[in-house]
From Swiss-Prot:
Main location group: membrane
GO biological process terms held by the UniProt record: adaptive immune response; cell surface receptor signaling pathway
Name of the protein this chain belongs to: T cell receptor beta variable 24-1
Name of the gene this protein is made from: TRBV24-1
Residue ranges the record marks as coiled coil: none
Residues bearing carbohydrate: N103
Length: 115
């Protein structure tokens, strides 16, 4: 029997800079089989330079996966293993789970900042 994983995206705006930034994550919710590749898209409309991907496991705080301070500027966070990102445009920052495993079941948050 194949294991199913549940990934839930949420909207999150980092508490620095402008508080009216529009940040969108797609898909909003995702269920997949173990071993499948998953892509989460983050887009923003305020032209912020900095974008971040976080993960929150049940009962724990946010953990930084990757961050970017500008287009094609990619930096690893504290838990980047098993993930990859792409930032080909200022307004978009994509997160990929290369091969979904049960311990990656979590809430995933995208954030932006202009500072």
């Amino acid at each position: 029997m194949a294991s199913l994983l549940f990934f839930c995206g949420a909207f999150y705006l980092l508490g620095t800079g402008s508080m009216d930034a529009d940040v969108t994550q797609t898909p909003r919710n995702r269920i997949t089989k173990t071993g499948k590749r998953i892509m989460l898209e983050c887009s923003q409309t305020k032209g912020h330079d900095r974008m971040y991907w976080y993960r929150q496991d049940p009962g724990l705080g946010l953990q930084l996966i990757y961050y970017s301070f500008d287009v094609k500027d990619i930096n690893k966070g504290e838990i980047s293993d098993g993930y990859s990102v792409s930032r080909q445009a200022q307004a978009k920052f994509s997160l990929s789970l290369e091969s979904a495993i049960p311990n990656q079941t979590a809430l995933y948050f995208c954030a932006t900042s202009d500072l």
